Amino acid sequence: MASAEPRPRMGLVINAKPDYYPIELSNAELLSHFEMLQEYHQEISTNVIAQSCKFKPNPKLIDQQPEMNPVETRSNIITFLFELSVVTRVTNGIFFHSVRLYDRYCSKRIVLRDQAKLVVATCLWLAAKTWGGCNHIINNVVIPTGGRFYGPNPRARIPRLSELVHYCGDGQVFDESMFLQMERHILDTLNWNIYEPMINDYVLNVDENCLMQYELYENQVTYDKQCSEKRQSQLSQDSDATVDERPYQNEEEEEEDLKLKIKLINLKKFLIDVSAWQYDLLRYELFEVSHGIFSIINQFTNQDHGPFLMTPMTSESKNGEILSTLMNGIVSIPNSLMEVYKTVNGVLPFINQVKEYHLDLQRKLQIASNLNISRKLTISTPSCSFENSNSTSIPSPASSSQSHTPMRNMSSLSDNSVFSRNMEQSSPITPSMYQFGQQQSNSICGSTVSVNSLVNTNNKQRIYEQITGPNSNNATNDYIDLLNLNESNKENQNPATAHYLNGGPPKTSFINHGMFPSPTGTINSGKSSSASSLISFGMGNTQVI
């Protein structure tokens, strides 16, 4: 049996191939657009910044998510969203804007873990329908062009619901009706305010949106250069005339500038995608993040770039924090992002350069930390040894023996004061009272010894000085009488003051003679402390017999 003839295709059949968008036309459109922007430059910049600040996510509220803790879950959910944006072939900037919608939604609603993919996929769908892009430089509205031209921008690509259902669980978890319900829920939560400025408005200039046009122009320049070289080689073989090299130099300079421009556009797009993973950047405004992106580009490319919009200047501290966050994000770049950008012109050398710089910086910080630790150990080592406790030391200077009350003698040198430093107590802040359990034999009714019954130590000190002084003849008899009196009243003597009569004045050691000496009114007065002064001296005097 003869094979059946193929049935003709029904419907409109288009065999036309898209043409390249004319470069002359795109240049004229860009020039006209720049002239218009110059007239309303300040008003446009003010409005863009105001809208960005108005719709800024709140990281403090995102931190309160019970199941979607950003520290634990953000990396995984953003990686899934990026992979979804790659397989659905959405245009540049849609991924970052969908992350922005997700953060704004998390600032107002609780997101369950099993519904996280549904939320981020719906945010991607909304962002693609809002900022899907088209194949025109100036227009921002999604308008189908019919595929007549190739370039200068990628065509609009809005994911189908069937694609989202397939990539979010192959129809076993979510269906199309759930995406429609979630879309309406997100719109109601955000009050239908999903049309906000993008970070591309700050980082990418108008002419940098037409990367396809630059790549097309680069291919054309390369092809013209090859044809010109062949033509010049044929002319040089046919004739001995010298060939003018000035056209070659101009073409090489133009080609080099074109390559640098393409690398710059690729780096900007790469850093925009890297910033989407960094949760710490939510604390800053979009224009501050854009300044950080330009700072890291200028640092590693030795160029001077800035935003086209008029934006406020960022403080050095904020700019340094953003720069450090971006560098950490590049060092720990996700594998899915690396797979996409490893073949893009100029991105992989930039990543390696940042990693080398970060590694070198970590080494320097480690060396500085080790030096600081060694210095601390050297300083904490005592520079001189303390004096032995048995060494002779300077006695305490004499002070007034008068006290305001008999029970509380505030004189710092009085041994019969309740705050005496010669008695051991539990704490220098809370002094302990003297306890006398001895009975005085000649006291009335056998009462215990009172504080007033004790002989004042300062009076003993003056008697001692009189004995050893020039007029010691008259004072010797008084001193002998005092010895006899104390011998008869030995049971009522304070052991802390007995050494005045037996061995001379007390020996007090003053070790801390530095800038911060220890207080003399506490029990810790005679103890050395290396924390109070780094330099301590042990001083003594000759004991008088």
From Swiss-Prot:
One of its GO terms (molecular function) is cyclin-dependent protein serine/threonine kinase regulator activity. Residues 404-414 have a biased composition (Polar residues). PROSITE patterns: CYCLINS. The keyword Cell division applies. Coiled coil: none annotated. SMART domains: CYCLIN (SM00385). It holds the Pfam family Cyclin_N. The keyword Kinase does not apply. One of its GO terms (biological process) is re-entry into mitotic cell cycle after pheromone arrest. Residues 389-403 have a biased composition (Low complexity). SUPFAM superfamilies: Cyclin-like. Keywords: Cell cycle, Cell division, Cyclin. InterPro entries: Cyclin-like_dom, Cyclin-like_sf, Cyclin_CLN, Cyclin_N, Cyclins_cyclin-box. One of its GO terms (cellular component) is nucleus. Residues 230-252, 383-414 are annotated as: Disordered. Belongs to the cyclin family. PANTHER family: CYCLIN N-TERMINAL DOMAIN-CONTAINING PROTEIN 1. A dominant mutation in CLN2 gene (CLN2-1), advances the G1- to S-phase transition in cycling cells and impairs the ability of cells to arrest in G1 phase in response to external signals. Present with 1270 molecules/cell in log phase SD medium. This is G1/S-specific cyclin CLN2. It comes from Saccharomyces cerevisiae (strain ATCC 204508 / S288c) (Baker's yeast).
